């Protein structure tokens, strides 16, 4: 759609934008500089996935992001530019990951050996070591298989390649559920190629040299 009469003579338009997530708000902010914008939102608040709530703790008020709100400057160049244009303060984010199953019966955290084996029983757990082996195999092979995945689901890809329940239920599905705020039981229905491509683009399948993640200061 051409929104100008000519390069030197813009026509002021009435623009409707549906949805007040990051895409809608960014478009509204940019277009409002030259046009009349009306924003439509079905919810009773704006912000979409971004939603910070505050609660009182024993140490004072704490701001909590109910969504998984982080970005990195490599994968999100336009968002980075928007934050800089608006002077939005950001800070480095701790991107740690931990899993707890069965009310603490089985737990581990990523990042270091201390976290992986914080629960000493993991040292002699066949299920845990199976997860580690298949994690390394998936991280190594899944990107290479992108061209042959076609339209199959993540569940189908994992089944065809012999990945077991430990890897699915104790690592891959909880990680995806945390990132996308979706039930872990639904992750397997995602298209395998889209899932793996997202993970590759965001450095999630790299064991080292991962991107530096940031978040908005104060939520």
Language model features by range: what are they?
Residues 1-15, 34, 55:
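Extreme N-terminal leader/targeting segments of oxidoreductases
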Residues 12-39:
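N-terminal Rossmann-like FAD-binding beta1-loop-alpha1 element of flavoenzymes
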Residues 22-23, 44-46, 177-178:
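Short, solvent-exposed loop/turn segments at secondary-structure junctions
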Residues 32-56:
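Glycine-rich FAD pyrophosphate-binding loop
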Residues 36-38, 63, 89:
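Conserved beta-strand segments of alpha/beta enzyme cores
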Residues 53-79:
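N-terminal glycine-rich dinucleotide-binding loop that anchors FAD/FMN and/or NAD(P) in oxidoreductases
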Residues 72-207:
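Mobile amphipathic helical/loop "lid" adjacent to a hydrophobic cofactor/ligand pocket
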Residues 209-219:
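Short, intrinsically disordered, charge-balanced linker/junction segments flanking boundaries
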